[in-house]
Structures are given as structure tokens and as C-alpha cells.
């Protein structure tokens, strides 16, 4: 399939499908016409020797330095080379690929003044999966993600490394193999490639996809735990949740009842106890709040995916054309959103760890063996899995500290406030990985716990999950290296996010 790009209507679901099916991209004719018209403005500026930031001047503190006309193109190449100061491990291939798609989509709005040739080069790289190797660290999140996007731009001009067919290789080598020339950057184009928030937004899109999936997965995992503990279903009654009327809470309660429908292990209030602990009783309230966060983040990401965040921006007003220096590259809206996402995911892990603690604690688990050990004393069972979960949620509490409240001035105080949004995105993904492992641990323990209660009494939907997962992780009949089980179930959960 082909993903049509026009700068206006790209969605997270489009990106998810694009990644899952290895689609190609195609630019609409209408968008190309906007690009051409925008470029005409840049050519007019050059012809008339106007003073416009980043086209005929230097950058940052050097914005008052006028550049000679015969050096306009070299200025753009120098910009890319000097700004490619990223360090550390690279972004995943998926994030870097999404970064290219998002930057292309921004250019198609027709406010950036690039050539059609640059657009075509981006399309070629995306469709042939020539993916720039982009270090994760080094961005302040304003003026956009300068360092990461400079590494992206390097690949387009045949410098730097790329991922290609499963290997990291020199970009010039790949271009030679494909008989493709590197792009020759024209005036304004280097700046148009790197002034934006595509690194934080691309990682943010991946974060959202996997976080939302974790939210849904946490429900059937919690449903297994609920049955192992003979939980009370009255708390999920629709009347309770409509009385508060948060839609996400109502939806989680309905889905929990759906997962539990037909179970012979659940109870009603008064059967065994009058009410459950909060980690069971308040699943709709807790998980629902995380979905509120996810919905907020999705809205902000999709705004930014279709936004013009270059500088300066070109506006064709019919009778006149305006070139305006602004600050749409500032990542604060996305930085806030991605910090918020960290909280929503962290709480899914926090409540999961408390649920799995109830499963292994003989004082709380309604008659199950201590730590679900097949031979208590001789075999430790799930004891240290709870330790691991506790460690992961504690680590998340430090990672959840908001990056967006920090700022360090740069460029001799010309760029005196920055967003740190890319740090928020990176820390957010670490939180998601940790949370996924916590939920994997709850899954393993809940699967074992329901075996003590009789798996034939599970609800039909959770019984299907039980059978599916037993092909991945066997029953605990004796102590073994549980880290392998945790990683296997975690990978299973991650794979589900893209199905």
C-alpha cells in the first residue's frame, strides 16, 4: 500500500499501518504545487538580495551576518555538518524512519521553501528504507531537534551512516550501490530540514503506539489477576462509572466486564468479602485516567505531525508573499505532552506491581501458596519476580521527572529558553519498556495463580489468552531462569502493539 502525504492529514494510525506493512509514501500533486510556489519565493529573495534569516544570513548569534550570494548553498551544507553533534546510541530504525516521514510531511505544507528535488530525495530514502543513523542525545528541543535532524540531513547529502537491509553502512556506499546521487542542498534547504520537532515527535509517536497498546493489554492481564484473587465484579457496574462520567473510565469498566464475562472464579460483594482492595476495585478509575492521558497526547502529536515548524516560514497571500521569523520549532507543547505520557504509563506499571504483589503474598492472595512456589522453602517460585517489578517501577519514578521544566540557554543567550522535549521522549520510551516488563511479570504470575484456582473456570476470553501464552511461557513446576520468561512475554506484548 501507499501512504499519501499532503502535509495536512497524517495520523498516528497511518504511521502504525506504514510501519506494520512496510508501505511506501507518495506525495500528492497539490502538495507539490505548494512546494514549488514556496520555492519561487526563496528564488525571488535571492534574486533581489533581500535580508532573510537563514537564507541570506548566518544562524543563531550570527543572524546579523550577511552571506555572499555565491556561498548560499555552502552555508546550508556547513549548517548540516556543524550541527550534526548528536552523541550516544542511535534511535531505532523505526523512529528514524518515522522522523523522515514527519519531516517530509512538514515540508509539504509549502511554508519551507525547499525544492521539489529535496522532497523527491526524502521520498526515495523512505521508500527504499535508507534510514539515517541518528544519535539520540544532543537535542535541546528548540530550535527544534537540530542535532538529530542534522544527522538525518547528512544522509541525504551522502554523508554519515545509514541503516540499509539490516546493516549500518556509509550512506555514500548505499547511494553508489543504487546508482543514486546525493542531494545538492540549495539556499534555505539545510535550515528547512533541521528546524523542527521531528525527533521528539517521531519517538513520541512510537511511545504513544506502544503505550496505548499497554493500556489495553493491562486490562486482560488484570482480568487474569482478578480471577486468581476471586475479585468482585460489582465495582465494574456501569452505574458506578456513569455516576462519575469520565468516558475513559466507563470504557475500561465495560471492557473489564467483557474480559470477565462467563468466569466462574469471580465473585459478587458479600460472597467472600464486601469489597476488594483498590488495585482490583479501582482498575477503571486508574487505567481510565491513563487513557485520558493517552487521548491528550494523541491529539497534540497529530497536531504537530501536520504542523509547519520551520523558521522562517513563507506565506503566499496572493497579492503579497510574507516571510516571517517565528518560533514554531519550539518543542514545548510536545515536551509537556510526552512528560504527561510518562505519568500515564508509569501508573499502569505501579498498579500492576501492586496486583502481582497480592498474588504472591500469602497474607493477601486468598489461599494461594506463598510466592506460588511449587515447594515452598525448597523453591522460591515467583519471589524475585516481584523484586524485579519493584525495581522497575522505582526506576520509572525517577525517569518520570519532567524534562520539560528544565531549560539551559544556548547560542550566546539568543536561544535562551528550550523545551528538552527529546529527553522527555527518550525517557518515556524507557518507562514504556520497564512498564511492559512489569506487566509481563504480572502475566506470568497470574497465569500460574489461575492454575491453582482451576483454569477451566476462567472466562472464555481470558482462557484463550491463557492457552496462547502457555505456548510462550510454561507453567512453573520448579525454579528456573525466569528472566527468559519475562523477556519472552514482554516481546509478545510489544509485538501485539503493531498488530
UniProtKB/Swiss-Prot annotation:
It is an enzyme of class 4 (lyase). Its EC number is 4.3.1.3. This is Histidine ammonia-lyase. Belongs to the PAL/histidase family. It comes from the Bacteria. Contains an active site 4-methylidene-imidazol-5-one (MIO), which is formed autocatalytically by cyclization and dehydration of residues Ala-Ser-Gly. InterPro entries: Aromatic_Lyase, Fumarase/histidase_N, HutH, L-Aspartase-like, Phe/His_NH3-lyase_AS. Disulfide bonds: none annotated. GO terms for molecular function: histidine ammonia-lyase activity. It catalyses: L-histidine = trans-urocanate + NH4(+). Pathway: Amino-acid degradation; L-histidine degradation into L-glutamate; N-formimidoyl-L-glutamate from L-histidine: step 1/3. Keywords: Cytoplasm, Histidine metabolism, Lyase. It is found in: Cytoplasm. GO terms for cellular component: cytoplasm. It comes from Staphylococcus saprophyticus subsp. saprophyticus (strain ATCC 15305 / DSM 20229 / NCIMB 8711 / NCTC 7292 / S-41). The modification 2,3-didehydroalanine (Ser) is found at residue 143. One of its GO terms (biological process) is L-histidine catabolic process to glutamate and formate. NCBIfam families: hutH (TIGR01225), PRK09367.1 (NF006871). Its main location: cytoplasm. There is a cross-link at residues 142-144 (5-imidazolinone (Ala-Gly)). PROSITE patterns: PAL_HISTIDASE.
Amino acid at each position: 500500500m501507499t501512504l499519501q502525504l499532503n502535509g495536512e492529514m497524517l495520523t498516528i494510525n497511518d504511521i502504525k499501518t506504514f510501519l506494520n506493512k512496510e508501505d511506501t509514501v507518495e506525495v500528492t500533486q497539490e502538495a507539490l504545487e505548494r512546494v514549488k510556489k514556496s520555492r519561487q519565493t526563496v528564488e525571488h529573495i535571492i534574486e533581489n538580495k533581500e535580508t532573510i534569516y537563514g537564507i541570506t544570513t548566518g544562524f543563531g548569534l550570527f543572524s546579523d551576518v550577511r552571506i555572499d550570494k555565491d556561498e548560499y548553498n555552502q552555508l546550508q551544507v556547513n549548517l548540516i555538518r556543524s550541527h550534526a553533534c548528536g552523541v550516544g546510541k542511535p534511535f531505532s530504525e523505526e523512529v528514524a524512519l518515522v522522523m523522515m516521514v514527519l519531516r517530509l510531511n512538514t515540508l509539504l505544507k509549502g511554508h519551507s521553501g525547499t525544492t521539489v528535488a529535496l522532497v523527491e530525495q526524502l521520498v526515495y530514502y523512505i521508500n527504499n528504507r535508507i534510514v539515517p543513523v541518528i544519535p539520540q542525545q544532543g537535542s535541546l528541543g528548540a530550535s527544534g531537534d537540530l542535532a538529530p535532524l542534522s544527522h538525518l540531513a547528512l544522509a541525504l547529502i551522502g554523508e554519515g551512516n545509514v541503516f540499509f537491509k539490516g546493516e549500518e553502512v556509509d550512506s555514500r556506499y548505499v547511494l553508489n550501490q543504487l546508482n543514486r546521487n546525493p542531494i545538492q542542498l540549495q539556499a534555505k534547504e539545510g535550515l528547512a530540514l533541521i528546524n523542527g520537532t521531528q525527533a521528539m515527535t517521531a519517538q513520541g509517536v512510537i511511545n504513544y503506539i506502544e503505550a496505548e497498546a499497554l493500556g489495553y493489554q493491562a486490562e486482560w492481564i488484570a482480568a487474569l489477576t482478578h480471577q486468581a484473587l476471586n475479585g468482585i465484579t460489582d465495582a465494574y457496574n456501569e452505574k458506578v462509572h456513569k455516576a462519575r462520567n469520565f468516558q475513559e473510565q466507563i470504557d475500561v469498566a465495560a471492557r473489564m466486564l467483557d474480559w470477565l464475562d462467563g468466569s466462574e472464579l469471580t465473585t459478587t460483594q458479600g460472597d467472600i468479602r464486601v469489597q476488594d482492595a483498590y488495585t482490583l476495585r479501582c482498575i477503571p478509575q486508574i487505567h481510565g485516567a491513563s487513557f485520558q492521558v493517552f487521548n491528550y497526547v494523541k491529539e497534540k502529536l497529530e497536531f504537530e505531525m501536520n504542523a509547519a515548524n520551520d523558521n522562517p516560514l513563507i506565506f503566499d497571500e496572493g497579492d503579497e508573499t510574507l516571510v516571517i521569523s517565528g518560533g514554531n520549532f519550539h518543542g514545548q507543547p510536545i515536551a509537556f505532552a510526552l512528560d504527561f505520557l510518562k505519568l500515564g504509563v508509569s501508573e499502569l506499571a505501579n498498579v500492576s506491581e501492586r496486583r502481582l504483589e497480592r498474588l504472591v503474598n500469602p497474607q493477601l492472595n486468598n489461599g494461594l501458596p506463598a510466592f506460588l512456589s511449587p515447594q515452598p522453602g525448597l523453591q522460591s517460585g515467583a519471589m524475585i519476580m516481584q523484586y524485579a517489578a519493584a525495581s522497575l517501577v522505582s526506576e520509572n519514578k525517577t525517569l518520570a521527572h519532567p524534562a520539560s521544566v528544565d531549560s539551559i540557554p544556548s547560542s550566546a543567550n539568543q536561544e535562551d529558553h528550550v523545551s528538552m522535549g527529546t529527553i522527555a521522549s527518550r525517557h518515556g520510551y524507557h518507562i514504556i519498556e520497564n512498564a511492559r516488563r512489569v506487566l509481563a511479570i504480572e502475566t506470568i504470575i497470574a497465569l500460574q495463580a489461575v492454575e491453582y484456582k482451576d483454569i477451566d473456570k476462567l472466562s472464555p476470553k481470558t482462557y484463550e489468552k491463557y492457552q496462547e501464552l502457555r505456548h510462550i511461557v510454561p507453567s512453573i513446576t520448579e525454579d528456573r531462569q525466569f528472566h527468559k520468561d519475562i523477556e519472552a512475554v514482554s516481546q509478545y506484548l510489544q509485538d501485539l502493539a503493531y498488530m
